UniProtKB/Swiss-Prot annotation:
Cofactors required: Zn(2+)
Co-factor remark: Binds 2 Zn(2+) ions per subunit.
Protein's name according to its UniProt entry: Deacetylase EF_0837
Lineage, opening ranks: Bacteria, Bacillati, Bacillota, Bacilli, Lactobacillales
Modified residues (N6-carboxylysine): 152
InterPro entries listed in its UniProt record: Deacetylase_Atu3266-like, EF_0837-like, Metal-dep_hydrolase_composite, Metal_Hydrolase
Family: Belongs to the metallo-dependent hydrolases superfamily. Atu3266/EF_0837 deacetylase family.
Tagged with keyword Metal-binding: yes
Keyword annotations from UniProtKB, A to Z: Hydrolase, Metal-binding, Zinc
Binding site for Zn(2+) 1: 58, 60, 152, 270
Taxonomic source organism: Enterococcus faecalis (strain ATCC 700802 / V583)
EC number from the UniProt entry: 3.1.1.-
Pfam families, alphabetized: EF_0837-like_N
Binding-site residues for Zn(2+) 2, renumbered to this chain: 152, 186, 209
Function statement: Esterase that can catalyze the deacetylation of acetyl-(R)-mandelate, but with very low efficiency (in vitro).
Amino acid sequence: MDYDLLIKNGQTVNGMPVEIAIKEKKIAAVAATISGSAKETIHLEPGTYVSAGWIDDHVHCFEKMALYYDYPDEIGVKKGVTTVIDAGTTGAENIHEFYDLAQQAKTNVFGLVNISKWGIVAQDELADLSKVQASLVKKAIQELPDFVVGIKARMSRTVIGDNGITPLELAKQIQQENQEIPLMVHIGSAPPHLDEILALMEKGDVLTHCFNGKENGILDQATDKIKDFAWQAYNKGVVFDIGHGTDSFNFHVAETALREGMKAASISTDIYIRNRENGPVYDLATTMEKLRVVGYDWPEIIEKVTKAPAENFHLTQKGTLEIGKDADLTIFTIQAEEKTLTDSNGLTRVAKEQIRPIKTIIGGQIYDN
């Protein structure tokens, strides 16, 4: 068989030998060894890992925004990330402009449409409910079916003004009117209170910033235990997503949750230019290292940046190393080296291992990291 690209001598994160062949931008073969010729062959060094391309399901990468912005390839292909999902930076009135720009990126870019029609042009996009127009959201979803993979509602004090839980009620209505499209909900300081938010969320809805260190988070700061209503949401199938961000990941909360048996379903950064350049986020790999230091193992960490986000946002051609899927791969090493990691609240932990992307393959095209 003649392939476009053959990757030799790789191993999965579980340590199993793997070789991958690519033809016409799709995975054509996956096996311990593959024979056959290819236009290009990559021979990996011993101890090099290959996974499905990493997916970051919470980023902000519409470069024309002033508040939260970045450039898809700076947080994507250059960092070992093959696919990013912009989490509601734009709304129905400006998502088409974002779409046009996103098509120029090497990185695969998808978007969640903010239920507020201009997105995050200011911090309080849900303070004026006249900006939430279901018909406009529906139009955006219908006009950009290969780009819009969900909707976003930011449910915290600085965003909602005096509107309480109402914006989330509107978001749930919009979701129901659009074939139960995925919904991501941002949480932060009250109001609204987290128990009100979680009561409205259903199985498959994505709760981002799940391990924030705020009083309105999942941890009861008086008892140092996970709140009962957070467990109820977790057990009914609400998707707990990291969404690290500048203010929204706390080591102690994540460690306490793990001790009690609660794990994030997906790992994401909430990255934008300032927390990329100045920290504490930097990139997806650093966020993955933080979950390793909390106590997650590498195979589950990789699953939480590949298969899990692909399933949550219905990216059916991505997320696994299977024949016929898109030829998006991340090639990386895991080195035994110490590194101090800092969360959003200034807490530090010393990682014993560093994960480093060395090549990113998107649609069969190779990019060095």
